[in-house]
């Protein structure tokens, strides 16, 4: 009897899977979108390249586009478009409603966070709570804090020169960005810049979990369990230590609010805790999730852009010398400082900053948008409402029709484009675009401008056991990753500029 029940269940399952497969291929709303039938039938096709191959699905996507064209249905429910000129239609601004894809793996891990908020109106409310803290005016008011940390960083470069120390630029610049971001959010200083080897448990945690990202993308909902495991049992145990720190800081702020001892200092966390919104938007869990996410986003991406930029200046001394000549117009002496506003006006420096961002790629994982009410039209194909649609930032950053010889670090391309009135910034999409673009863009740009200007004006550097090829993307681990190991950029300070 039991065997008959099992047999009947298996037959029923087989029939159900067959019916579902037929529906997805021949009757699904996306049936007219080009792509392999196996991808239309099952997510396992995508999961194989993500989880088994280790972050290689981005290259399979590229292959599918070469075969099927610029629009591809790459899993049963989602469409990918590889057309740089169409990017702004997917990641649009204005009042047009666009939701987050509820299937995005980070949604269950970071509930209550602005960037993972699914519904358009709810996202707009949460974004509005913190938006003013990321305005250019507000960031400019904190420029003295950024410059003081950059000066401390420069003193560490001088120390490295005197002792012949090899610098891991990602960790060096992450010390700067994590200290600044944590100060911005909590009003406290983790003081990574004072660590002898720029020790950063948070970044070490991100490096540890990196190889697991493709697997976690497949089993996204299991990520929630990681929060309840002892740090010693989790590959990124160091990451969870920051979780504990954020928990404590949020508790302190809420306690000070309750007993009236918060004081006049206004941090991002305090602004969130005192915002005129419903209490469910100010729970300890949501405040912790939101602030932790901001620190994560503000640490690695900006540090990576700085590491990429400084590496290329070290790799091609002619670029560094050209930049230094320009910097002398506003920074006549090595220890001179210039404002962010002054630095933004320097064309070659702007080109260096833009190339640093472009070739660091930002957050490259597909982050689909869903238009709940409106269809999108691409060429002669109608993408129905409710369809997750994405475009990887990597393909825009490396589009040879926009950026000729895209693998080259070429600041002059931006100088020439500005001279000719060609708006290349339209395709600098490392902060995304539209109503859900990264709020931290102004803070990140201020850090990058001030840090690159200071380092380039004061120091000569050479790469150390790092090649251009090692910076090229081979795997999609959320961030661009080399074939093996974490992203690493090392250099030595060889001289002090005059």
Swiss-Prot record:
Transmembrane segments: 5-27
GO molecular function: heme binding; iron ion binding; monooxygenase activity; oxidoreductase activity, acting on paired donors, with incorporation or reduction of molecular oxygen
Subcellular location, record wording: Membrane
Keywords of the record: Glycoprotein, Heme, Iron, Membrane, Metal-binding, Monooxygenase, Oxidoreductase, Transmembrane, Transmembrane helix
Entry's Gene Ontology cellular component terms: membrane
Main localisation: membrane
CDD domains in the cross-refs: CYP58-like (cd11062)
EC number per UniProt: 1.-.-.-
Classification via InterPro entries: Cyt_P450, Cyt_P450_CS, Cyt_P450_E_grp-I, Cyt_P450_sf, Cytochrome_P450_monoxygenase
Gene3D superfamilies: Cytochrome P450 (1.10.630.10)
Lipid bilayer topology: Single-pass membrane protein
Family from the record: Belongs to the cytochrome P450 family.
Function in brief: Cytochrome P450 monooxygenase; part of the gene cluster that mediates the biosynthesis of aflatoxins, a group of polyketide-derived furanocoumarins, and part of the most toxic and carcinogenic compounds among the known mycotoxins. The four major aflatoxins produced by A.parasiticus are aflatoxin B1 (AFB1), aflatoxin B2 (AFB2), aflatoxin G1 (AFG1) and aflatoxin G2 (AFG2). Within the aflatoxin pathway, the cytochrome P450 monooxygenase aflU is involved in the last steps in which OMST is converted to aflatoxins B1 and G1, and DHOMST to aflatoxins B2 and G2.
Full protein name: Cytochrome P450 monooxygenase aflU
The encoding gene: aflU
